[in-house]
Amino acid sequence: MRHYEIVFIVHPDQSEQVPAMIERYKSTITSHGGQIHRVEDWGRRQLAYMIEKLAKAHYVCMNIECDQTTLDELEHAFKFNDAVLRHLIVKMKKAETGPSPMMKEVQREEAKKAAAAQPAEAQA
């Protein structure tokens, strides 16, 4: 089996369905004997360019290990799911299990928001 990194972008109106989509894709992978090494929900982020007149979308990153038939099935699911605006599948040399650079940035932003919220609560 080979290692892959998958990033897909979901329509912002469908953001509440992202956890169900992730579970569906995870069950597809595991039911065919694959493994999931990392799943990161990057949340709603600014797009680099407009896609279908949208400026923001919901990003999800998955690092998996699977065979070609499972990968074909996932790609088919991405293509025929109207909520998925774009997807990218990249073959990796080894499994990535640590947080991605994008996730580190998301964690930094959340830490800043939490730090800003604490002094505001202390003053109230």
Swiss-Prot record:
Q: Domain of life of the organism in this record? A: Bacteria
Q: Which UniProt keywords apply?
A: Ribonucleoprotein, Ribosomal protein, RNA-binding, rRNA-binding
InterPro entries named in the record: Ribosomal_bS6, Ribosomal_bS6_sf, Ribosomal_S6_plastid/chlpt, Transl_elong_EF1B/ribsomal_bS6
* Pfam families, A to Z: Ribosomal_S6
Key word Ribonucleoprotein present in the record?
A: yes
Tell me the protein's name.
Small ribosomal subunit protein bS6
Naming one, the record's GO cellular component terms include: cytosolic small ribosomal subunit
Q: Which organism is it from?
A: Burkholderia orbicola (strain MC0-3)
- Which protein family is named in the record? Belongs to the bacterial ribosomal protein bS6 family.
Q: Which GO terms describe its molecular function?
A: small ribosomal subunit rRNA binding; structural constituent of ribosome
Biased composition of type Low complexity is found at 114-124
